[in-house]
Amino acid sequence: STFVNADCFDVFPFIEDKSIDAIIADLPYGTTQNKWDSILPLNKLWKEYKRILKDSGCVVLFAQTPFDKVLGCSNLDWLKYEWIWDKKLGSGSLNVKKMPLKRHENILVFSKGKTTYNPQMTKGKFRNKSTSKPSSNKGNYGEITHQKDNFNDDYYPTTILEFTNANVRARVHPTEKQLSLMEYLVKTYTNEGDTVLDNTMGSGTTNLACIKLNRK
């Protein structure tokens, strides 16, 4: 894993075309007065992302309202879906009498086409696992015939990710994400040996996840 302390737009020219398997980054949201929290020029950013990303790659970006709306609209052609990260603890106590505490953030997933997706299964209670085949009668998905197959305790992920936010006192960066959350995203969207880019490194949590999971 390589760390570069520089303006990402100064570094992009040194990254080869179609050399990146996934971009996983926590961009500035532009919601605070901090100097580092300035929204990057998104048109310029997408130009570089599209150049360096492999055709089978994906872009996974953290966001929060209102920035998530701006970010999604910046590349609607590539926008596929979003995760909701439930941080378990709310923030924004100074505004508690004007608005609800912010307990979640959005994670937007973009791709040009089919991309790597390794669903992280969880264990739950045993249930009947059914298989289904569309018939020749066409509805939204065709007429579905369910056939009970066997008992299974593997559950596919939903769009809600539950990870407690990083310990405030131990943070290196104000917007630091939990290592376990970054590992989840790296495992979901890449395979061992893949190359991952985080162009807004912060505390380097994405890099740590990649080192631990044998990604470059």
Labelled PLM ranges:
Residues 1-216:
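Core catalytic lobe of class I
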